[in-house]
Amino acid sequence: CTALTDLSCFGNQLTSLDVSNNTALNILECSSNRLTSLDVSNNTALKNLWCYENKLTSLNGSSNTALTELDCSDNKLTSLDVSNNSALTKLYCSYNQLTSLDISNNTALFDLSCHNNQLTSLDLSNNKALTDLSCSDNQLTSLDLSNNTALKNLWCYENQLTSLDLSNNIAL
């Protein structure tokens, strides 16, 4: 069905999902399954992708330029490229195995949850719209929030931070 715009198939035992012909898909919720791979390269209209609680080892969203919300938490991702997703406002990628996360092109991002990974650094200098940040349980040694003046909620516990300057974050 090429006219399909919303697909919700969460909470099953799916090991594969073929949405390659569903080019009109706006919303895909395939969370809580057993997916090891997910090809959304033909789904260029995709705005919301919820694929958390699977077994994904990789996720390529480079062709999903309309994507505003991505939840790929609780998978086995070692890398995540969101550089082409400039419309992204919400990114949830917690409980993976990410060692780095480049969100410099995601200037519309206001909600970022990247806790419980293996991040050693996190550059938020371009993310001025950020209001919510959860980066706990990583290996961060520093966290520069001087450009994130809109920040209202911050969770950064269980890292290796030695100092934290919140003087510009008056909304906290």
Residue ranges: model-predicted function:
Residues 1-3, 22-25, 41-46, 62-67, ...:
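Leucine-rich repeat
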Residues 7-9, 26-30, 47-51, 68-72, ...:
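Conserved hydrophobic beta-strand positions in leucine-rich repeat
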Residues 5, 56, 96-99, 161:
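Generic alpha-helical secondary structure signal
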